[in-house]
Amino acid sequence: MEWRKTADGSPTLYHPIYQEAYHPWQGALSQARLLYLEGTRTHLHPSPRVLEVGFGLGVNFRVTLESTLQRGVRLFYLAVEKEPLPREVLAFPLGLASDGAFLALLEKLPGPVEAPWGWFGLLVGDVREVELPEAFASAIYLDPFSPRVNPEAWGLEVLQKLRKAALPGARLATYSAAGWVRRNLEAAGFRVESLPSPWKRAWTAGTALET
């Protein structure tokens, strides 16, 4: 794998098999904050419970943890990752208030980990196969590799599974605006809308409907 610097100065990795980077060239930190943290309104939630598909380099978690640390609220975070990266790869600095807590967390992975700031769990495996808790999440970060190279992670069966893991009214955010992904989200029980992006393409948000 090859390290690359994104436009906001934060690093990402290029995956040679998927032939994609873990983050957009416009900015790893920018996407984590604008799309996932703010797009799901997790930055306003009094006790967020986040489910992430595609933990990757942990940037979304680190940005979310910084937000909860600064606000003095507890974070419950469950991540799914098919190909977890080594600790020494994940331990890069981002200049965030959460850097120290993240380094301490790495020593205890895969966990689960209880800490003064909250709770973290990492499910290692294919999202189609791992068992997810029902009615857990106030927010879902849907961030696997793209539908073009990793369509299985975006299938209807997976999205129905995510809906069951979501609380009613939970917010889902993803960078993909592919038509078939949006249709699958609707079929799975999410109200779908476009989310403005500072870059060329809009993102996608969903709200978990009552069943």
Label the model's feature ranges.
Residues 141:
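A conserved beta-strand element that flanks and buttresses the S-adenosyl-L-methionine
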Residues 91-94, 207-211:
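Short, surface-exposed amphipathic charged segments that create phosphate/polyanion-binding patches used
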Residues 42-138, 152-159, 188, 197-200:
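The AdoMet/dcAdoMet-binding core of the Class I SAM-like
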Residues 1-47, 57-70:
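Class I SAM-dependent methyltransferase Rossmann-like catalytic core
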Residues 144:
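Glycine-rich, N-terminal phosphate-binding loop of Rossmann-like dinucleotide-binding domains
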Residues 150-210:
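C-terminal substrate-binding/active-site "lid" region of AdoMet-derived donor-dependent transferases
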Residues 56, 147, 173:
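Glycine-/small-residue-rich active-site loops that bind phosphorylated ligands and cofactors
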